[in-house]
């Protein structure tokens, strides 16, 4: 479920925290992906028309395997190094949310039966109810783990919530950010939230990146206040306070500094604002601030050669996939290996933030000394040139020599960074 309305609130109040990118902008990036969320998305999205989810001849659902195979290859073709993190046990405090999901599933089942028996429902109505019934099973998670291992992609088993472990891997510097649609990864502390990684090419959705530090700056909150705001807005661990939405919640947190101050004020505000009888905000806060996660010092993320024979055996002989298609997928996967062995230049020079004054200075120096405009452009746009300029105080001559040695635009080469 995530946090009710959080992405919209950040977009409205801290728009500088949200950027849109193409997938290949993450070339060389390691991203921790919420596997459980991905499986759920594939079970819903990968379908065969009115017949529902993809199945093999034995009637086994294969939507999750098909989706994970091709979306992961697509990420790797863009140079991304995905590491998939799987949910462990659900926190006890999440029991209320899980019970609500069970109730919603029962309602959807009853409505689907009614539509099918009465003949009143359109194909769209029936598909909508079918999607509401989708739940990822433990067996489907094991299917995907086996697939990813054969693909040479690292798998991490979280002791509890996958988003929490993803966030801690990012905080520890083992990955760049968290790939999920659930905004509560920000509440768990991921520096970067990356959305739409699993969107199909046909949807043409850009990758949406939310920067936590910029969100906090734009919202004018500390991390502790941000966590309290997320609980106030509604999360998996507690209900909301009637009458308080995202904007009102932000206003109250900024005015009263924390949840305790907000609750004291709400009690004076009259019957319009109703605090739930059970509102375990302290326990919810603890789950966000000190979640149960893997010990990052023991995590060793490695991307290895795909096991072509193992993939053929698993997908073709065990899961009854088309052999020709599987062989083509393996060829694509093998071609990704070269890309995924490359690193971003900042892994050598450190992260580079380009200051406007530096950008102008480098560009001016290159234009002055480079008669070749293409070389000058390559020179001043290069992170290498900027890093060398800072580190060694190079003049325009060495910079332009470097610029001429770099690939020209239009030559089919990837720009550094």
Enumerate the language-model features and the residues they cover.
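Non-catalytic, usually N-terminal nucleic-acid engagement modules in DNA/RNA processing proteins
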Residues: 1-106, 113
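Non-catalytic nucleic-acid-binding/docking modules located in mid-to-C-terminal regions
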Residues: 13-27, 209-372, 378
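Amphipathic alpha-helical interaction motifs in eukaryotic regulatory proteins
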Residues: 43, 67-69, 73-77, 145, ...
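Serine residues within intrinsically disordered or low-complexity segments
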Residues: 369, 373, 377-382, 405, ...
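GST-like fold's C-terminal all-alpha helical module
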Residues: 385-409
């Amino acid at each position: 479920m995530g946090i009710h309305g959080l992405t919209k609130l950040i977009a409205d109040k801290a728009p500088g925290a949200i950027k849109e990118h193409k997938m290949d902008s993450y070339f060389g990036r390691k991203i921790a992906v919420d596997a459980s969320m991905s499986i759920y998305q594939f079970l819903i999205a990968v379908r065969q028309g009115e017949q529902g989810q993809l199945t093999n001849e034995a009637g086994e659902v294969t939507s999750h395997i098909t989706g994970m195979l091709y979306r992961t290859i697509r990420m790797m073709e863009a140079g991304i190094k995905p590491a998939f993190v799987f949910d462990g046990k659900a926190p006890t405090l999440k029991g209320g949310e899980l019970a609500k999901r069970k109730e919603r599933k029962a309602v959807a089942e009853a409505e689907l039966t009614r539509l099918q028996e009465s003949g009143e429902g359109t194909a769209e109505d029936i598909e909508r109810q079918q999607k509401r019934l989708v739940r990822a099973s433990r067996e489907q998670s094991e299917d995907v783990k086996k697939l990813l291992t054969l693909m040479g992609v690292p798998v991490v088993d979280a002791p509890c919530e996958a988003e929490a472990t993803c966030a801690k891997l990012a905080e520890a510097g083992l990955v760049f950010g968290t790939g999920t649609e659930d905004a509560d990864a920000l509440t768990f502390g991921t520096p970067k939230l990356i959305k739409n990684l699993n969107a199909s090419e046909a949807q043409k959705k850009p990758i949406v990146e939310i920067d936590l530090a910029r969100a906090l700056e734009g919202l004018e909150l500390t991390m502790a206040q941000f966590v309290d705001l997320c609980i106030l807005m509604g999360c998996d661990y507690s209900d909301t306070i009637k009458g308080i939405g995202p904007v009102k919640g932000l206003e109250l947190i900024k005015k009263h500094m924390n949840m305790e101050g907000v609750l004291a004020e709400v009690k004076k505000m009259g019957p319009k604002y109703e605090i739930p009888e059970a509102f375990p905000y302290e326990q919810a806060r603890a789950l966000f601030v000190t979640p149960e996660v893997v010990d990052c010092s023991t995590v060793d993320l490695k991307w290895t050669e795909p096991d072509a024979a193992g993939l053929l055996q698993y997908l073709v002989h065990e899961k009854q996939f088309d052999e020709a298609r599987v062989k083509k997928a393996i060829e694509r996967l093998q071609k990704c290996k070269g890309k995924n062995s490359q690193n971003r230049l900042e892994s050598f020079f450190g992260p580079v933030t380009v200051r406007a004054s530096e950008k102008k200075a480098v560009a001016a120096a290159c234009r002055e000394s480079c008669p070749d405009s293409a070389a000058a452009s390559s020179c001043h746009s290069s992170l290498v040139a900027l890093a060398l300029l800072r580190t060694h105080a190079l003049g325009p001559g060495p910079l332009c020599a470097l610029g001429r040695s770099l690939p020209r635009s239009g030559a089919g080469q990837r720009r550094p960074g």
